[in-house]
């Protein structure tokens, strides 16, 4: 309350001060000084150069030890005005009331806690008093118990020693009793067939009998036990040799014989011999299933039988052998490995024979499942008998079967391709029914392409089963690398594409062999098929293969560009051969028409010969046929009078000097020399020039071969006047229709000029027909 009285009231502001407004300036300076004091870390007294703390002897210091209320009140009355004193009193009253209220609240809030704490302390004091009493009683009881225990121990010391001695004697007597009863126990166990119990009895007593065998009584017991043990060993050997029981029972017999001290080497040989008999029986059972009987199980059942019978038995034999004859060391392990290697090779031979019967089937799913079970079953013996190499041999068999399946699928693709070509041949050779058109070349080409592509996809899906994640051998290095790159991509896909190209090229053989009977339309279709493969199909197939079979092998593979180049070359050869075949067909007609006619005695021409009409018809049909598969191509600019030109013996400049009216015998000139001079300035015609992949180039090649044949045949014949005129009419007719098929019409003009000029040279009386008459005959024809 003294502090509250000393504090100025909240209502005393600057206006109530006696200084009034004049005190505002010093107040601001004090605030500024206070901020500086806080900045430099100085107290108010230090900032003014005075001591920082109040005087401890000051009687007006409310917090000091020498505070004097009377002095403090006198000071306030002297220094403070009445208004400030009243404000101080009001503020003091308010603070006293607030303090009183806070103290009452504090007392009320903690009253219950104080009461509870008091009760708890009182109860703890009572409990500790009771505990001290009980501890005292416990200490007294413990002292009494200790005293009694000491007296009892002292009293029982001598009897305890006697009891210990008696217990030892009793145990010895029990052991002796067991030893004396051992022969009878062994005999009873042998009679009951409890061979394991008998061996355990013998094992427990063996060391004692060996130790005390110098005593007559123990010696007799040992002799009796040896006789019984010998009989027991004989019965165990008899049971083991009978082999009627399974592998676990035989292993138990061997284990008991080893416990009886029988020679391990001899038992090892007998154990393997009996195991060989059982496993060979399993092999004979498997071999019996390889017969041609219709009731023979499928390959999946066969591998299940072999896995559960032979492989399971081999695992049992290996596990029992390693457990029983572990003391044999490396020699025993090698003996077991040789045993497993020999029988395993016979089992693998049977499996391969059975798998070979599946090579003709087209479904890989059952075969892959069988291979998976076969490979999975051999994991256990492969781990037990690592030295025998069973797992590696099984993997090699699976890899070999996979390679054979790839070869089988390649043959299937080749057969499918040949079958498609056979279908095309039949469709081309089938007679046309009136009013019903057969399939066109474009449709046949689409059918062949889709059929081949579907067979390729089916083969890829079939061989992809070998690399499925759920298959146990798919993680082997071969199936993650070489199988995908060299097997599927190179052997199957690339091999088939090359085989297809070779088969197509075989149709280009010389006449009289295979190519002589090949329909020209088939050559045209195959050339377009190979060209389509070069442009898109090869890239698509190889991309599909690489996506399905993620190649992890770094071995080199055939680039796409190489295959495309081979396919394009095959297409070029086929198209070139097509041009030759069609050209020879037309040439044969022209040659026969020239060679079988008597040109010296022929009549004056009135019509175009029928063979020329047939040539134009066949050429038009070829144009339609080629147009179904190939684009038009590029032609040179055509002259406006291509169809109006009329051939005559003087249409060529080299013949004008001979047949023009101005020619007189007084100006002789060798016509052959004139013809040869003209040839020097004419463009050379390459009859068998490379054929481009368009219709114009194909027709140009065929027409060049035909007209060149006509020219050579004409040069070998002699013509009369009317014969020359007939050739003139025929050539004009050909010119009217053939110029539109070739890339350059000048080529047709040049060759036909050569034909007419050659006929004129071979005519003794060359009198040409008037051009107007020729045109009339051709228009009428």
Swiss-Prot record:
Alphabetical keyword list: Coiled coil, Endosome, Golgi apparatus, Lipid transport, Phosphoprotein, Protein transport, Transport
Domain of life: Eukaryota
Biased composition regions of type Low complexity, renumbered to the chain: 1-18
Sequence segments annotated as region (Disordered): 1-66
Gene Ontology annotations of biological process type: endocytic recycling; Golgi organization; Golgi vesicle transport; lipid transport; lysosomal transport; protein transport; retrograde transport, endosome to Golgi
Location of this chain's protein in the cell: Golgi apparatus, trans-Golgi network; Recycling endosome
Gene Ontology cellular component annotations, sorted alphabetically: cytosol; EARP complex; GARP complex; Golgi apparatus; membrane; recycling endosome
Pfam families per the UniProt record, alphabetical: VPS51_Exo84_N
Coiled coil: 115-146, 269-291
InterPro entries: Cullin_repeat-like_dom_sf, Vps51
Residues with PTM Phosphoserine: 17, 43, 648
Oligomer and partners: Component of the Golgi-associated retrograde protein (GARP) complex, also called VFT (VPS fifty-three) complex, composed of VPS51, VPS52, VPS53 and VPS54. Component of the endosome-associated retrograde protein (EARP) complex, composed of VPS51, VPS52, VPS53 and VPS50/Syndetin. EIPR1 interacts with both EARP and GARP complexes and mediates the recruitment of the GARP complex to the trans-Golgi network. Interacts with STX6 (via N-terminus). Interacts with VPS50 and VPS54 in an EIPR1-independent manner.
Family: Belongs to the VPS51 family.
Purpose of the protein: Acts as a component of the GARP complex that is involved in retrograde transport from early and late endosomes to the trans-Golgi network (TGN). The GARP complex is required for the maintenance of protein retrieval from endosomes to the TGN, acid hydrolase sorting, lysosome function, endosomal cholesterol traffic and autophagy. VPS51 participates in retrograde transport of acid hydrolase receptors, likely by promoting tethering and SNARE-dependent fusion of endosome-derived carriers to the TGN. Acts as a component of the EARP complex that is involved in endocytic recycling.
Protein name (record): Vacuolar protein sorting-associated protein 51 homolog
Gene: VPS51
